[in-house]
UniProtKB/Swiss-Prot annotation:
PROSITE patterns: CSD_1, CSD_2. The keyword Protein biosynthesis does not apply. CDD domains: CSP_CDS. This is Cold shock protein CspB. Affects cell viability at low temperatures. The lineage of its organism: Bacteria, Bacillati, Bacillota, Bacilli, Bacillales. InterPro entries: Cold_shock_CspA, Cold_shock_domain, CSD, CSD_CS, CSP_DNA-bd, NA-bd_OB-fold. It comes from Sporosarcina globispora. One of its GO terms (molecular function) is DNA binding. The gene is cspB.
Length: 57
């Protein structure tokens, strides 16, 4: 995770060799409060969103 704003519910994932990927809290799987921490490693799929690539699942 490059950065994630838990108040606004979105951030960006740094992908080696590619552009950063947008992530919205609704794409985070799990129960309860959905938040990601800077530097956290995550697995995800890249889907095409309204404004370009974004993370899913």
């Amino acid at each position: 995770i490059k950065w994630f704003n838990s108040e606004k519910g979105f951030g960006f994932i740094e992908v080696e060799g590619q552009d950063d990927v947008f992530v919205h809290f609704s794409a985070i799987q799990g129960e309860g409060f959905k938040c990601l921490e800077e530097g956290q490693a995550v697995s995800f799929e890249i889907v095409e969103g309204n404004r370009g690539p974004q993370a899913a699942n």
